[in-house]
Amino acid sequence: MQQIYTVKEIRSVAARSGPFAPVLSATSRGVAGALRPLVQATVPATPEQPVLDLKRPFLSRESLSGQAVRRPLVASVGLNVPASVCYSHTDIKVPDFSEYRRLEVLDSTKSSRESTEARKGFSYLVTGVTTVGVAYAAKNAVTQFVSSMSASADVLALAKIEIKLSDIPEGKNMAFKWRGKPLFVRHRTQKEIKQEAAVELSQLRDPQHDLDRVKKPEWVILIGVCTHLGCVPIANAGDFGGYYCPCHGSHYDASGRIRLGPATLNLEVPTYEFTSDDMVIVG
């Protein structure tokens, strides 16, 4: 039958052993008995390989160093600059723009001053042609835009009026509507013609001879709007037998010239044309 000696018992024996006490006290050992083992037996584990996720890159010092540039080193040394080392890339393809360059400057060993005038002339020619084309296109665009704002054909048709002169008796004045304004057409007598032709220009506020206001002496065509504040004068009235403005008392003669009152200008003469002895077109 085996016995198990404890540590305390071994130490007590070593203490009583005399000169061998230091040796015996420095060593202690447990002796296993048959009843219970001191240390449980361990079963060796089977080693397993670690499984890596191949979808994700494995970053380590070795993998990162493998991606570094591995090219010949180029060192540059100068007197006034510190030494430097850089990596030289020999796999870079420099683009060639020879197809887009002019023939005169393809040769790098040839001076470009010899072809300066020719190249400048070509550039000026292209610029001039482009400028003319842009100006022509802009002119057409502006013309079309301005013409779109002009009056239409039906409006232009109303801008002119035909008047039959045989409907106006001698010594009478007829009023028409033209462009939204009253239009006076007066058939003057010989007495009125001589009277207005004899008026001296020094007596007029707005000097103008009678022959300068008519194309035919017997016909006077005027716009019936007072030049003072825009009232409509009355025909065959006033101190001079022509037109009278009842608003502020302006007097005009038979030629439409201002003679008295606050108005300062003569009645306006529109543009007209005699197409025949019996027809006139105003506008």
From Swiss-Prot:
It comes from the Eukaryota. Residues 196-281 form the Rieske domain. Its cofactor is [2Fe-2S] cluster. The chain crosses the membrane at residues 116-149. One of its GO terms (biological process) is mitochondrial electron transport, ubiquinol to cytochrome c. One of its GO terms (molecular function) is 2 iron, 2 sulfur cluster binding. PANTHER family: CYTOCHROME B-C1 COMPLEX SUBUNIT RIESKE, MITOCHONDRIAL (PTHR10134). This is Putative cytochrome b-c1 complex subunit Rieske-like protein 1. It comes from Homo sapiens (Human).
